[in-house]
Amino acid sequence: MGLIVQKFGGTSVGSVEKIQNAANRAIAEKQKGHQVVVVVSAMGKSTDELVSLAKAISDQPSKREMDMLLATGEQVTISLLSMALQEKGYDAVSYTGWQAGIRTEAIHGNARITDIDTSVLADQLEKGKIVIVAGFQGMTEDCEITTLGRGGSDTTAVALAAALKADKCDIYTDVPGVFTTDPRYVKSARKLEGISYDEMLELANLGAGVLHPRAVEFAKNYQVPLEVRSSTETEAGTLIEEESSMEQNLIVRGIAFEDQITRVTIYGLTSGLTTLSTIFTTLAKRNINVDIIIQTQAEDKTGISFSVKTEDADQTVAVLEEYKDALEFEKIETESKLAKVSIVGSGMVSNPGVAAEMFAVLAQKNILIKMVSTSEIKVSTVVSENDMVKAVESLHDAFELSKHPSAV
Protein backbone atom coordinates (compact mmCIF):
# COMPACT_ATOMS: atom_id res chain seq x y z
CA MET A 1 0.00 0.00 0.00
CA GLY A 2 1.06 3.62 0.43
CA LEU A 3 2.64 5.92 2.97
CA ILE A 4 0.49 8.28 5.05
CA VAL A 5 1.72 11.19 7.15
CA GLN A 6 -0.62 12.25 9.94
CA LYS A 7 -0.33 15.47 11.92
CA PHE A 8 -2.04 16.16 15.25
CA GLY A 9 -2.05 19.66 16.69
CA GLY A 10 -1.89 20.64 20.34
CA THR A 11 -5.65 20.51 20.95
CA SER A 12 -5.81 17.06 19.32
CA VAL A 13 -3.22 15.63 21.75
CA GLY A 14 -4.10 17.79 24.74
CA SER A 15 -4.88 14.93 27.12
CA VAL A 16 -4.12 11.25 27.63
CA GLU A 17 -7.52 10.42 26.18
CA LYS A 18 -6.79 12.45 23.05
CA ILE A 19 -3.37 10.83 22.69
CA GLN A 20 -5.11 7.44 22.81
CA ASN A 21 -7.43 8.68 20.05
CA ALA A 22 -4.45 9.76 17.93
CA ALA A 23 -2.93 6.31 18.45
CA ASN A 24 -6.15 4.72 17.19
CA ARG A 25 -6.05 6.93 14.09
CA ALA A 26 -2.52 5.77 13.33
CA ILE A 27 -3.50 2.13 13.92
CA ALA A 28 -6.47 2.46 11.54
CA GLU A 29 -4.13 3.47 8.70
CA LYS A 30 -1.64 0.77 9.64
CA GLN A 31 -4.39 -1.85 9.49
CA LYS A 32 -5.14 -0.75 5.92
CA GLY A 33 -1.59 -1.75 5.03
CA HIS A 34 -0.10 1.74 4.95
CA GLN A 35 3.23 2.82 6.34
CA VAL A 36 2.50 5.55 8.89
CA VAL A 37 4.42 8.60 10.10
CA VAL A 38 2.78 10.73 12.80
CA VAL A 39 3.85 14.34 13.47
CA VAL A 40 2.67 15.90 16.73
CA SER A 41 2.66 19.25 18.47
CA ALA A 42 3.14 19.91 22.17
CA MET A 43 0.15 18.94 24.32
CA GLY A 44 -2.57 21.55 24.72
CA LYS A 45 -1.21 24.84 26.02
CA SER A 46 2.11 23.41 27.22
CA THR A 47 4.09 25.67 24.85
CA ASP A 48 2.40 28.73 26.38
CA GLU A 49 3.23 27.40 29.84
CA LEU A 50 6.89 27.02 28.88
CA VAL A 51 6.94 30.59 27.57
CA SER A 52 5.46 31.78 30.87
CA LEU A 53 8.18 29.96 32.79
CA ALA A 54 10.85 31.65 30.67
CA LYS A 55 9.26 35.08 31.18
CA ALA A 56 9.25 34.47 34.93
CA ILE A 57 13.03 34.08 34.74
CA SER A 58 13.86 36.76 32.18
CA ASP A 59 12.03 39.60 30.45
CA GLN A 60 14.13 39.00 27.34
CA PRO A 61 15.35 35.41 27.28
CA SER A 62 17.82 34.54 24.52
CA LYS A 63 16.27 33.08 21.39
CA ARG A 64 18.66 30.14 21.50
CA GLU A 65 17.64 29.17 25.02
CA MET A 66 13.96 29.66 24.15
CA ASP A 67 14.35 27.14 21.34
CA MET A 68 16.06 24.72 23.72
CA LEU A 69 13.14 25.13 26.12
CA LEU A 70 10.23 25.06 23.67
CA ALA A 71 11.54 22.00 21.82
CA THR A 72 10.92 19.94 24.97
CA GLY A 73 7.13 20.30 24.61
CA GLU A 74 6.89 18.04 21.57
CA GLN A 75 9.23 15.48 23.14
CA VAL A 76 6.63 14.79 25.82
CA THR A 77 3.96 14.13 23.20
CA ILE A 78 6.03 11.84 20.97
CA SER A 79 7.04 9.68 23.92
CA LEU A 80 3.49 9.32 25.24
CA LEU A 81 2.06 8.56 21.80
CA SER A 82 4.73 5.95 21.14
CA MET A 83 3.96 4.36 24.53
CA ALA A 84 0.23 4.34 23.71
CA LEU A 85 0.86 2.53 20.42
CA GLN A 86 3.17 0.02 22.05
CA GLU A 87 0.58 -0.64 24.76
CA LYS A 88 -1.94 -1.43 22.02
CA GLY A 89 0.43 -3.99 20.54
CA TYR A 90 1.99 -1.95 17.73
CA ASP A 91 5.70 -1.40 17.18
CA ALA A 92 6.34 2.33 17.36
CA VAL A 93 9.37 4.57 17.77
CA SER A 94 9.62 8.30 18.49
CA TYR A 95 12.12 10.85 17.19
CA THR A 96 12.84 14.49 17.86
CA GLY A 97 13.06 16.75 14.82
CA TRP A 98 16.84 16.54 14.67
CA GLN A 99 16.86 12.75 15.15
CA ALA A 100 14.45 12.58 12.22
CA GLY A 101 17.02 14.35 10.03
CA ILE A 102 15.31 17.73 9.79
CA ARG A 103 17.89 20.43 9.00
CA THR A 104 17.07 24.12 9.23
CA GLU A 105 18.45 27.62 8.83
CA ALA A 106 20.30 29.08 11.80
CA ILE A 107 17.42 31.39 12.75
CA HIS A 108 16.15 30.79 16.25
CA GLY A 109 12.40 31.03 16.73
CA ASN A 110 11.40 31.09 13.06
CA ALA A 111 13.74 28.78 11.14
CA ARG A 112 12.93 27.31 7.74
CA ILE A 113 13.57 23.71 6.79
CA THR A 114 16.46 23.42 4.34
CA ASP A 115 16.86 19.64 4.03
CA ILE A 116 15.61 16.34 5.42
CA ASP A 117 17.71 13.18 5.65
CA THR A 118 15.02 10.51 5.62
CA SER A 119 17.34 7.50 5.98
CA VAL A 120 16.54 6.83 9.66
CA LEU A 121 12.79 7.16 9.16
CA ALA A 122 12.80 5.08 5.98
CA ASP A 123 14.70 2.31 7.75
CA GLN A 124 12.19 2.19 10.59
CA LEU A 125 9.24 2.23 8.20
CA GLU A 126 10.72 -0.70 6.29
CA LYS A 127 10.84 -2.58 9.60
CA GLY A 128 7.09 -2.06 9.90
CA LYS A 129 7.18 0.48 12.70
CA ILE A 130 4.85 3.42 13.18
CA VAL A 131 7.18 6.43 13.32
CA ILE A 132 6.38 9.38 15.59
CA VAL A 133 8.16 12.70 14.89
CA ALA A 134 8.19 15.91 16.92
CA GLY A 135 6.87 18.82 14.87
CA PHE A 136 7.97 22.45 15.07
CA GLN A 137 11.70 21.72 15.46
CA GLY A 138 14.95 20.87 13.70
CA MET A 139 18.69 21.36 13.88
CA THR A 140 21.23 23.51 12.06
CA GLU A 141 24.44 22.29 10.44
CA ASP A 142 26.21 23.38 13.63
CA CYS A 143 23.98 21.12 15.76
CA GLU A 144 21.95 24.01 17.18
CA ILE A 145 18.32 23.22 18.01
CA THR A 146 15.82 25.52 16.28
CA THR A 147 12.06 25.93 16.22
CA LEU A 148 10.03 26.71 13.12
CA GLY A 149 7.68 29.37 14.45
CA ARG A 150 3.92 29.56 14.16
CA GLY A 151 2.44 26.65 12.20
CA GLY A 152 5.73 24.79 12.45
CA SER A 153 4.19 21.38 13.06
CA ASP A 154 2.04 21.71 9.91
CA THR A 155 5.19 22.55 7.97
CA THR A 156 7.09 19.61 9.50
CA ALA A 157 4.34 17.19 8.46
CA VAL A 158 4.13 18.47 4.88
CA ALA A 159 7.93 18.59 4.52
CA LEU A 160 8.25 14.99 5.73
CA ALA A 161 5.45 13.92 3.39
CA ALA A 162 7.31 15.52 0.48
CA ALA A 163 10.69 14.06 1.45
CA LEU A 164 9.27 10.56 1.98
CA LYS A 165 7.11 10.82 -1.17
CA ALA A 166 4.01 10.07 0.88
CA ASP A 167 0.70 9.46 -0.84
CA LYS A 168 -1.07 11.98 1.38
CA CYS A 169 -0.70 14.16 4.45
CA ASP A 170 -3.68 14.23 6.83
CA ILE A 171 -3.92 17.27 9.13
CA TYR A 172 -6.09 16.44 12.15
CA THR A 173 -7.63 19.44 13.91
CA ASP A 174 -10.54 20.38 16.15
CA VAL A 175 -12.65 21.24 13.07
CA PRO A 176 -13.95 18.74 10.46
CA GLY A 177 -12.42 20.52 7.47
CA VAL A 178 -12.14 23.82 5.62
CA PHE A 179 -15.40 25.78 5.59
CA THR A 180 -16.72 28.41 3.19
CA THR A 181 -16.22 30.83 6.09
CA ASP A 182 -15.90 30.65 9.87
CA PRO A 183 -18.98 28.72 11.11
CA ARG A 184 -18.72 30.43 14.48
CA TYR A 185 -19.88 33.63 12.78
CA VAL A 186 -21.98 32.29 9.89
CA LYS A 187 -24.16 29.34 10.88
CA SER A 188 -24.84 28.40 7.25
CA ALA A 189 -21.13 27.96 6.45
CA ARG A 190 -20.52 24.71 4.57
CA LYS A 191 -17.61 22.31 4.74
CA LEU A 192 -15.80 22.14 1.40
CA GLU A 193 -15.12 18.75 -0.15
CA GLY A 194 -12.11 20.12 -2.00
CA ILE A 195 -10.11 23.28 -2.58
CA SER A 196 -7.04 24.11 -4.67
CA TYR A 197 -3.61 24.90 -3.25
CA ASP A 198 -3.84 28.47 -4.56
CA GLU A 199 -7.24 29.09 -2.98
CA MET A 200 -6.15 27.58 0.33
CA LEU A 201 -2.97 29.65 0.28
CA GLU A 202 -4.98 32.84 -0.19
CA LEU A 203 -7.40 31.91 2.61
CA ALA A 204 -4.52 31.01 4.93
CA ASN A 205 -2.74 34.30 4.21
CA LEU A 206 -5.99 36.18 4.78
CA GLY A 207 -6.47 34.85 8.29
CA ALA A 208 -8.18 31.46 7.94
CA GLY A 209 -6.47 29.64 10.80
CA VAL A 210 -6.95 26.04 9.69
CA LEU A 211 -3.52 25.77 8.03
CA HIS A 212 -0.40 27.89 8.12
CA PRO A 213 0.48 29.50 4.76
CA ARG A 214 4.02 28.09 4.84
CA ALA A 215 2.67 24.53 5.03
CA VAL A 216 0.28 25.12 2.12
CA GLU A 217 3.08 26.66 0.05
CA PHE A 218 5.27 23.62 0.78
CA ALA A 219 2.44 21.28 -0.26
CA LYS A 220 1.90 23.18 -3.51
CA ASN A 221 5.60 23.26 -4.40
CA TYR A 222 6.00 19.51 -3.85
CA GLN A 223 2.48 18.49 -4.92
CA VAL A 224 1.60 16.84 -1.61
CA PRO A 225 -2.16 16.17 -1.33
CA LEU A 226 -3.45 17.45 2.02
CA GLU A 227 -6.63 16.56 3.83
CA VAL A 228 -7.85 18.62 6.77
CA ARG A 229 -9.84 16.30 9.03
CA SER A 230 -11.50 16.19 12.42
CA SER A 231 -9.54 14.43 15.13
CA THR A 232 -12.79 13.27 16.75
CA GLU A 233 -14.99 12.36 13.77
CA THR A 234 -14.48 9.69 11.11
CA GLU A 235 -16.05 11.42 8.10
CA ALA A 236 -13.93 12.74 5.24
CA GLY A 237 -12.50 16.22 5.58
CA THR A 238 -11.44 18.75 2.93
CA LEU A 239 -8.97 17.64 0.26
CA ILE A 240 -6.42 20.24 -0.84
CA GLU A 241 -4.72 19.52 -4.16
CA GLU A 242 -3.91 21.07 -7.52
CA GLU A 243 -6.97 22.89 -8.93
CA SER A 244 -9.61 20.69 -7.36
CA SER A 245 -12.09 19.17 -9.76
CA MET A 246 -14.59 18.62 -6.94
CA GLU A 247 -16.40 21.95 -7.02
CA GLN A 248 -15.40 23.52 -10.32
CA ASN A 249 -18.53 25.59 -10.86
CA LEU A 250 -17.98 27.66 -7.72
CA ILE A 251 -16.77 31.13 -8.66
CA VAL A 252 -16.18 32.05 -5.02
CA ARG A 253 -14.88 29.24 -2.81
CA GLY A 254 -14.68 30.96 0.53
CA ILE A 255 -14.66 34.15 2.58
CA ALA A 256 -11.89 35.11 5.00
CA PHE A 257 -11.90 37.99 7.42
CA GLU A 258 -9.86 39.53 10.20
CA ASP A 259 -10.39 42.46 12.52
CA GLN A 260 -7.98 44.80 14.33
CA ILE A 261 -6.80 46.50 11.15
CA THR A 262 -5.57 50.11 11.08
CA ARG A 263 -5.29 52.39 8.05
CA VAL A 264 -2.29 54.71 8.03
CA THR A 265 -2.41 57.73 5.71
CA ILE A 266 0.60 59.91 4.89
CA TYR A 267 -0.21 63.32 3.40
CA GLY A 268 1.96 65.67 1.37
CA LEU A 269 4.75 63.36 0.29
CA THR A 270 7.20 64.66 -2.26
CA SER A 271 6.49 62.73 -5.43
CA GLY A 272 8.90 60.03 -6.37
CA LEU A 273 9.30 56.28 -6.34
CA THR A 274 12.40 56.58 -4.17
CA THR A 275 10.34 58.04 -1.32
CA LEU A 276 7.79 55.21 -1.47
CA SER A 277 10.57 52.64 -1.57
CA THR A 278 12.19 54.25 1.47
CA ILE A 279 8.93 54.14 3.45
CA PHE A 280 8.24 50.46 2.93
CA THR A 281 11.87 49.38 3.20
CA THR A 282 12.11 51.20 6.53
CA LEU A 283 8.94 49.54 7.85
CA ALA A 284 10.07 46.12 6.64
CA LYS A 285 13.33 46.46 8.54
CA ARG A 286 11.25 46.95 11.71
CA ASN A 287 9.27 43.76 10.88
CA ILE A 288 6.09 45.72 10.20
CA ASN A 289 3.97 43.95 7.60
CA VAL A 290 2.15 46.35 5.26
CA ASP A 291 -0.91 44.99 3.48
CA ILE A 292 -3.20 46.99 1.19
CA ILE A 293 -1.62 50.11 -0.37
CA ILE A 294 -3.44 52.99 -2.10
CA GLN A 295 -1.68 55.98 -3.67
CA THR A 296 -3.21 59.32 -4.65
CA GLN A 297 -1.67 62.18 -6.63
CA ALA A 298 -2.52 65.88 -6.28
CA GLU A 299 -0.39 68.31 -8.29
CA ASP A 300 3.18 67.81 -7.08
CA LYS A 301 2.24 66.03 -3.85
CA THR A 302 1.54 62.36 -3.21
CA GLY A 303 -0.73 60.83 -0.60
CA ILE A 304 -0.49 57.21 0.39
CA SER A 305 -2.66 54.98 2.57
CA PHE A 306 -1.83 51.47 3.70
CA SER A 307 -3.15 48.98 6.21
CA VAL A 308 -1.30 47.31 9.07
CA LYS A 309 -2.34 45.19 12.01
CA THR A 310 -3.54 47.42 14.82
CA GLU A 311 -0.90 46.00 17.15
CA ASP A 312 1.73 47.47 14.80
CA ALA A 313 0.07 50.86 14.31
CA ASP A 314 1.82 52.83 17.06
CA GLN A 315 5.23 51.53 16.03
CA THR A 316 4.45 52.32 12.38
CA VAL A 317 3.68 55.95 13.19
CA ALA A 318 6.73 56.24 15.45
CA VAL A 319 9.03 54.92 12.74
CA LEU A 320 7.60 57.27 10.12
CA GLU A 321 7.85 60.28 12.44
CA GLU A 322 11.46 59.33 13.11
CA TYR A 323 12.19 59.70 9.38
CA LYS A 324 9.87 62.67 8.75
CA ASP A 325 12.63 65.05 7.63
CA ALA A 326 14.06 62.55 5.18
CA LEU A 327 10.65 61.53 3.82
CA GLU A 328 9.38 65.12 3.61
CA PHE A 329 5.69 64.57 4.36
CA GLU A 330 3.19 66.95 5.95
CA LYS A 331 1.27 64.78 8.40
CA ILE A 332 0.16 61.25 9.31
CA GLU A 333 -3.35 60.14 10.24
CA THR A 334 -4.56 56.73 11.41
CA GLU A 335 -7.97 55.09 11.46
CA SER A 336 -8.40 52.01 13.62
CA LYS A 337 -11.28 49.62 14.40
CA LEU A 338 -11.25 48.37 10.82
CA ALA A 339 -11.55 44.86 9.40
CA LYS A 340 -10.57 43.13 6.18
CA VAL A 341 -13.15 40.97 4.38
CA SER A 342 -12.00 38.92 1.37
CA ILE A 343 -13.63 36.62 -1.15
CA VAL A 344 -11.47 33.89 -2.71
CA GLY A 345 -12.05 31.60 -5.68
CA SER A 346 -10.15 30.43 -8.74
CA GLY A 347 -13.36 30.81 -10.74
CA MET A 348 -12.82 34.58 -10.69
CA VAL A 349 -10.13 34.21 -13.34
CA SER A 350 -12.68 33.33 -16.03
CA ASN A 351 -15.66 35.22 -14.60
CA PRO A 352 -15.36 39.03 -14.86
CA GLY A 353 -17.57 41.19 -12.70
CA VAL A 354 -17.13 39.37 -9.39
CA ALA A 355 -15.60 42.43 -7.71
CA ALA A 356 -18.45 44.60 -8.97
CA GLU A 357 -20.97 42.15 -7.54
CA MET A 358 -19.14 42.16 -4.20
CA PHE A 359 -19.18 45.96 -4.06
CA ALA A 360 -22.88 46.05 -4.97
CA VAL A 361 -23.76 43.62 -2.17
CA LEU A 362 -21.88 45.72 0.38
CA ALA A 363 -23.46 48.94 -0.93
CA GLN A 364 -26.95 47.43 -0.56
CA LYS A 365 -26.16 46.81 3.11
CA ASN A 366 -24.84 50.38 3.53
CA ILE A 367 -21.36 49.08 4.26
CA LEU A 368 -18.71 51.66 3.41
CA ILE A 369 -15.64 50.28 1.63
CA LYS A 370 -12.52 52.10 2.78
CA MET A 371 -9.80 50.20 0.86
CA VAL A 372 -9.67 47.57 -1.90
CA SER A 373 -7.07 45.06 -3.05
CA THR A 374 -7.38 42.43 -5.78
CA SER A 375 -5.51 39.50 -7.28
CA GLU A 376 -6.52 36.93 -9.90
CA ILE A 377 -8.41 34.84 -7.36
CA LYS A 378 -9.10 37.29 -4.50
CA VAL A 379 -10.85 40.56 -3.75
CA SER A 380 -10.22 42.16 -0.36
CA THR A 381 -12.06 45.12 1.13
CA VAL A 382 -11.43 47.07 4.32
CA VAL A 383 -14.58 48.03 6.23
CA SER A 384 -15.51 49.14 9.73
CA GLU A 385 -15.13 46.44 12.39
CA ASN A 386 -18.79 47.03 13.26
CA ASP A 387 -19.75 45.98 9.72
CA MET A 388 -17.46 42.94 9.49
CA VAL A 389 -19.89 40.16 10.40
CA LYS A 390 -22.73 41.76 8.39
CA ALA A 391 -20.43 41.96 5.37
CA VAL A 392 -19.39 38.32 5.66
CA GLU A 393 -22.98 37.10 6.11
CA SER A 394 -24.22 39.20 3.18
CA LEU A 395 -21.49 38.01 0.81
CA HIS A 396 -21.93 34.40 1.92
CA ASP A 397 -25.63 34.62 1.05
CA ALA A 398 -25.11 36.55 -2.19
CA PHE A 399 -22.63 34.03 -3.60
CA GLU A 400 -24.78 31.12 -2.32
CA LEU A 401 -21.86 29.49 -0.55
CA SER A 402 -24.09 27.48 1.78
CA LYS A 403 -25.41 25.48 -1.19
CA HIS A 404 -23.58 22.44 -2.54
CA PRO A 405 -22.25 23.17 -6.08
CA SER A 406 -24.67 20.67 -7.60
CA ALA A 407 -27.54 22.79 -6.25
CA VAL A 408 -26.22 26.16 -7.39
From Swiss-Prot:
Pfam families: AA_kinase, ACT, ACT_9. It comes from the Bacteria. It catalyses: L-aspartate + ATP = 4-phospho-L-aspartate + ADP. Lysine-sensitive. Regulated by degradation in response to starvation of cells for various nutrients. Ammonium starvation induced the fastest aspartokinase II decline, followed by amino acid starvation and glucose limitation. It is an enzyme of class 2 (transferase). One of its GO terms (biological process) is threonine biosynthetic process. The record marks 7, 74 as: Contribution to the catalysis. Keywords: Amino-acid biosynthesis, ATP-binding, Diaminopimelate biosynthesis, Kinase, Lysine biosynthesis, Nucleotide-binding, Repeat, Transferase. Its EC number is 2.7.2.4. One of its GO terms (molecular function) is aspartate kinase activity. Gene3D superfamilies: Acetylglutamate kinase-like (3.40.1160.10), VC0802-like (3.30.2130.10). ATP binds at residues 7-10, 41, 173-174, 179-184. Residues 264-337, 343-408 form the ACT domain. The keyword Repeat applies. CDD domains: AAK_AKii-LysC-BS (cd04261), ACT_AK-LysC-DapG-like_2 (cd04923), ACT_AKii-LysC-BS-like_1 (cd04913). The keyword Transport does not apply. Substrate binds at residues 25-30, 47-49, 74, 125-126, 150-153, 289-291, 295, 354-355, 368-369, 375-376. Transmembrane segments: none annotated. Pathway: Amino-acid biosynthesis; L-lysine biosynthesis via DAP pathway; (S)-tetrahydrodipicolinate from L-aspartate: step 1/4; Amino-acid biosynthesis; L-methionine biosynthesis via de novo pathway; L-homoserine from L-aspartate: step 1/3; Amino-acid biosynthesis; L-threonine biosynthesis; L-threonine from L-aspartate: step 1/5. Catalyzes the phosphorylation of the beta-carboxyl group of aspartic acid with ATP to yield 4-phospho-L-aspartate, which is involved in the branched biosynthetic pathway leading to the biosynthesis of amino acids threonine, isoleucine and methionine. Tetramer consisting of 2 isoforms Alpha (catalytic and regulation) and of a homodimer of 2 isoforms Beta (regulation). Belongs to the aspartokinase family. This is Aspartokinase 2. It comes from Bacillus subtilis (strain 168). The lineage of its organism: Bacteria, Bacillati, Bacillota, Bacilli, Bacillales. The gene is lysC.
